[in-house]
A protein has these predicted regions:
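Short pre-active-site segment immediately N-terminal to redox-active cysteine/selenocysteine motifs
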Residues: 63-65, 70-73, 137
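Hydrophobic beta-strand anchors of alpha/beta hydrolase catalytic cores
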Residues: 66-67, 95, 141
Length: 179
């Protein structure tokens, strides 16, 4: 009985080490979102460039849309920005932004200097609007179908590989197979 008393903590420790070791090899970008297949969370925030106007979930209905959560302090956001500008020029999809935990003048200056790929940008200075979306960092990009259902969530900078492998096939499926 005494040996079992010492063996149980050792076994528990080994199990924890096993879980930790397994976790080292998981890709954090593949964390499934509980929002996939569910309606996009309802929000209504000030529009970044014009606080008298609002940007709401309903603005993204009717066609496939991207919602990109970004910030000026985010290194990954700077990395993906040139790709977002290229994507905006193609007109493949309506793109919207949500500026997260930022200062309005800094965000406006960022878009003025680097270009604005978004049709509208929600200003979320305290992060309250992004909480319902399950955002815990930036950049994060959501693909939303015409009915407002979240189809896919991408963590980290968006680039050509993720666009071609993850987004394009889903958009084609929404459009009946046409690319």
């Amino acid at each position: 009985m005494k040996s079992l008393k010492y063996l149980l903590p050792a076994l528990a420790f080994l199990v924890l080490v096993g879980f930790f070791y397994r976790g080292l090899f998981l890709d954090p970008r593949t964390v499934p979102s509980p929002l996939i297949g569910k309606p996009a969370p309802v929000f209504e925030l000030e529009e970044l460039s014009n606080p008298a106007e609002t940007f709401a979930t309903s603005d993204m209905l009717g066609k496939p849309a991207l919602l990109n959560v970004w910030a000026t302090w985010c290194v990954g956001c700077r990395q993906e920005h040139s790709f977002l500008m290229q994507l905006a020029r193609t007109g493949e999809i309506d793109m919207y932004g949500m500026n997260l935990r930022d200062e309005r003048p800094k965000a406006l200056d960022w878009l003025r200097r680097l270009g604005n790929p978004y049709a509208k940008v929600a200003f979320d200075p305290d992060g309250a609007g992004s909480l319902d979306w399950g955002v815990y960092g930036s950049p994060e990009t959501f693909l939303i179908d015409p009915q407002g259902i979240i189809v896919y969530k991408h963590l980290g900078p968006l680039g050509p590989a993720a666009w071609m492998e993850e987004f394009r096939p889903r958009i084609a499926a929404m459009q009946g197979g046409a690319q």
